[in-house]
Amino acid sequence: GSGQILLRTVFLSLDPYMRGRMSDAASYSAPVGIDQTIEGGPISRVVDSQHKGYQPGDWVLSGNGWQDYAVSDGSGLINLGAQAEHPSYSLGVLGMPGFTGYMGLLDIGAPKAGETLVVAAATGAVGSVVGQVAKLKGCRVVGIAGGAEKCRYAVQHYGFDVCLDHRAADLAQQLAA
């Protein structure tokens, strides 16, 4: 219809907060009902548009949830343009998880060069950003992850100084070192 945009979902994000939404346990937000669309910010492609600000082929970040197609009036959409090189980055390092890690560390943690920072969930969307930004700030970064493979990844790909496997039998000894 007039002023509307037809969107096709291409990328979905599984963000840490969603786990709480998929349980009826007490949480800061209500759980998703069986018959409801899971909330989330997918990256979609404009299929058809009757809206002057959007053209077919544009990539958009929306709040339309986990569904194949959605119709929008443009409210709340972020147009990434038709030539976005890596649109999925807007769901991770350039999106909510990356922003959370970056701002949380710098505004709340306020790390100083030479300090040691311990990062839980070191290979997760938020933890991986926290560790990398802390390294840029001159910190010694100790990650915690579940499994030797994740720990290797944190050190080799994200630049953590060391990573402790919380599943290892000798975790207390690792922490003491």
Give the residues covered by each predicted segment.
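Short, glycine/acidic-enriched capping/hinge loops at junctions between secondary-structure elements
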Residues: 18-22, 125
